[in-house]
Amino acid sequence: VRVGSLFSGIGGFDLGLERAGMEIVWQVENEPYCIRVLEKHWPNVRRYGDIKEIDWSKVERPDLVCGGFPCPAVSQAARGRNTGEWFWPEFARALGDLQPDYAIVENVEGLLRERMAEVVGDLASM
């Protein structure tokens, strides 16, 4: 199974999926520290930076897309405050354009209360 990793961070999803026998074919991350960690552990994997700038028609279609998009808009720590960007639309754009066979979407519990209908609606329409 060929995997594309969104919001890769330091590669937790990637490592687990790789240990399960899957192949990481690309990663999306724009935090410098995280990129250094990814480069050390996956030196031959293609990396992309700002997810908003990616033209998905030029990216290899994986079998599986995984990721945990940044969650300040729905995190308990930010409850009641509009903090940070809402990155689900970028995750959905990637899924819609790439049409992988599988997707793993991870996020905080607050997503269930705050915006789960939007996420499920987008997934159902794909």
Give residue ranges: language-model regions:
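Conserved active-site and SAM-binding loop architecture
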Residues: 1-126
